[in-house]
UniProtKB/Swiss-Prot annotation:
Protein's name in the database: Cation/acetate symporter ActP
Xref: PANTHER family: CATION_ACETATE SYMPORTER ACTP, SODIUM/PROLINE SYMPORTER-RELATED
Taxonomic lineage of the native organism: Bacteria, Pseudomonadati, Pseudomonadota, Gammaproteobacteria, Enterobacterales
GO cellular component labels: plasma membrane
Pfam families for the chain: SSF
Protein function: Transports acetate. Also able to transport glycolate.
Quaternary structure annotation from Swiss-Prot or TrEMBL: Has been isolated from inner membrane preparations as a homodimer.
Side Periplasmic, residues: 1-32, 99-102, 169-182, 235-260, 326-358, 425-427, 485-493
Topology of this chain in the membrane: Multi-pass membrane protein
Predominant cellular place of this UniProt entry's protein: membrane
Keyword Transmembrane (UniProt): yes
Any one of the GO BP annotations: sodium ion transport
Native organism: Escherichia coli (strain K12)
Amino acid sequence: MKRVLTALAATLPFAANAADAISGAVERQPTNWQAIIMFLIFVVFTLGITYWASKRVRSRSDYYTAGGNITGFQNGLAIAGDYMSAASFLGISALVFTSGYDGLIYSLGFLVGWPIILFLIAERLRNLGRYTFADVASYRLKQGPIRILSACGSLVVVALYLIAQMVGAGKLIELLFGLNYHIAVVLVGVLMMMYVLFGGMLATTWVQIIKAVLLLFGASFMAFMVMKHVGFSFNNLFSEAMAVHPKGVDIMKPGGLVKDPISALSLGLGLMFGTAGLPHILMRFFTVSDAREARKSVFYATGFMGYFYILTFIIGFGAIMLVGANPEYKDAAGHLIGGNNMAAVHLANAVGGNLFLGFISAVAFATILAVVAGLTLAGASAVSHDLYANVFKKGATEREELRVSKITVLILGVIAIILGVLFENQNIAFMVGLAFAIAASCNFPIILLSMYWSKLTTRGAMMGGWLGLITAVVLMILGPTIWVQILGHEKAIFPYEYPALFSITVAFLGIWFFSATDNSAEGARERELFRAQFIRSQTGFGVEQGRAH
């Protein structure tokens, strides 16, 4: 019987070489009632939270940033919930299951961006901005052009990420719950719209917090049971895994995932700087009251995520022992049922039985809902706040801006559902990779240099930002993933899978060159305004504080 060829590697950033890409058909599995019941409990509970949140959303600040009343600890959990996708859980544990130590190296790529956010971005971002990162980028530059560029960068990242999440959700739910793919995509889209439409950032935050707690609990239990099996000895864990894995001792060696040093460097830079340019992550720093709480947010988030990625390493090696060596989880051809991405799900069954399998399946679904809700709110705020209220209709009232935001949520939700259905059998692995590359090549350079480089001008930011965005897209199209695997050409024009090294370089050089050669009076004025911006970014004087409801 033909099983799943893929589950969720496509939602893993730069997952072209991760376990499997999403492509081809998935055969529906028998209906998993335990998983469905647990998921329904989660949905009912979170819809209750959305109703509670809707009664407290009275203003633009409430809708975009939960009134700035989220604590650093709560925001840290929510950031972790926003960032730890189902692909992190299933994809990285699958990488460890197939490649061993390389999976740990890959997971570190998700973490290395957070020290940059902590030391370079979080505090100044909170002190300078209100609702979106474009508030920061345009603080002393021309509002119109910079907000259009920032909004375009945000919307492209959100759209690519959203499509990948929707397709991944449909495939995953079809596999785990036995539901029809189209029903699954519509269900995710409708729930996503309800959370954001009625509850805004407050509901989205609590959905992300609940999801993070459930995911951390589930992963902790699995890791505990694996370590209990080996007498809480890492030496026994690795020895037993090496004894049963087809690659033997080679699973403890690095270097099998990335072909050459250029690809490795480009992948690392994309993951590192892409994280610091994701609009739905940056938006979370405006939900706390001040810069101190923003720093706390990153501290807690990094701790939760670091702990989680250590757990995925243990889970991956546990799957090698308890799943890979067990014929119950193999099909007639000797392959893992459902593909390698199902390693963690099968391990849940192995250590906790059917009930825990249902719990982990429901958590995987909840994980996708939390991520798409954050993405949708980031996309809606880019349209309503950056474009509508600050470019096309300056001076718009809060009521008008919120109305546009909610209309955008509906449009984004409908588009996400339609594209999720259209891309059902397409290889969309490149989409999240491209999203990270664009975030690293367009959003990150502008955010960083607008806060730290006194000589930045609007001309430099515009030219460098657009060059970075276009370079990332063009190189991705000309690279092996799209040019060869999707378009069917014999040889790629651009030889590397990951464009970030080149597109980031183009962006920074473009910003530097066009700013340095800008001798206009407007450019001189923008340079003079840096001192006032610097004082605000350091002291927070004049920043909008959180307030009680």
